[in-house]
């Protein structure tokens, strides 16, 4: 665990958790020395796992906080869940789902349950980046993405009990989720 860009740049494997908001993190991480260190790890080919906001930061742009650029490692954008999504599909006049999306959801195709806590989701420009999907209301969004040594998950494996532990173990042992 480090906040030192020099230590991060020399790591053989990086797990980049994210908690908070895209705007303030952009200033601190993306535009700073840590952003350069993370890009270096990725370009070198070492395993990289972005969790929640850590995954979102891998992409080009987020609508959060008025719009900010990400690390631009992967093509795509980050969008907010609509605040008017019906809780029951096909019933636009009924109760609405709450944003943020907080709680347990299953992912496709594994069927395993993971814990999510987010208001924004990734829309990759390249759908082949997506390994697992999740649905919240009418929005199907990537639960996990992967390309080469880069891996990301929207859920919180550290809060996802056995499924999360298996996921992290798989990443640590194989450099992938």
Describe each region flagged by the PLM.
Residues 1-50, 56-72:
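Flexible gly/pro-rich beta->alpha loop and the following alpha-helix that scaffold active-site loops
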Residues 1-3, 33-37, 102-104, 117-118, ...:
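A generic local structural motif
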Residues 15, 49, 115, 131, ...:
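Hydrophobic/aromatic beta-strand patches that form the interior of the parallel beta-sheet core
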Residues 22, 35, 100-104, 164, ...:
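A general structural signal for well-ordered alpha-helical segments in protein cores
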Residues 23-24, 82, 152-154:
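A short acidic, helix-capping loop that chelates divalent metal ions and anchors anionic groups
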Residues 52, 118, 156:
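Histidine-centered divalent metal-coordination motifs
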Residues 60-138:
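Pocket-forming structural segment of enzyme catalytic cores
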Residues 122-177:
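C-terminal and late-domain segments of enzyme folds
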